[in-house]
């Protein structure tokens, strides 16, 4: 399986997780790509809650990703701290959906 990051994901990742924390997240997704909760009306986007910097799940981050089963690929789209927001807006979801449709029509 391959994991691909969008530029915005990479930018937001810096300073939120250490390299080791990120490696553990990647391993988790490789072993359980369907772990994230499916976001209704998003075309298959998933949201995974992940602890960051020893704060536990309540102080962690939410990872938005898409699992392309046929291509055996996970596309990491967006990440945000839980104290930053609770959910994405419908406009943000539509923008992420367009990324998926553009990458894998």
Question: Where would I find each of the regions flagged by the language model?
Answer:
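Arg/Lys-rich, positively charged N-terminal/basic patches that mediate binding to nucleic acids
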Residues: 1-20
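A generic structural signal for short beta-strands and their flanking turns/coil linkers
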Residues: 5, 25, 42-46
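Basic/aromatic recognition patch in beta-strand/loop cores that engages polyanionic ligands
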Residues: 38-76, 84
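Enriched for short, Lys/Arg-rich terminal
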Residues: 67-105
């Amino acid at each position: 399986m391959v994991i691909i990051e969008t530029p915005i994901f990479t930018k937001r990742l810096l300073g939120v997780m250490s390299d080791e924390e990120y490696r553990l997240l990647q391993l988790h997704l490789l072993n359980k790509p369907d772990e994230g909760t499916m976001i209704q009306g998003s075309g298959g986007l998933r949201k995974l809650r992940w602890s960051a910097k020893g704060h536990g799940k309540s102080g962690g981050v939410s990872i938005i990703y898409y699992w392309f089963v046929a291509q055996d690929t996970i596309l990491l789209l967006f990440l945000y701290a839980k104290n930053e927001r609770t959910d994405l807006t419908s406009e943000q979801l539509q923008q992420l959906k367009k990324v998926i449709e553009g990458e894998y029509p």
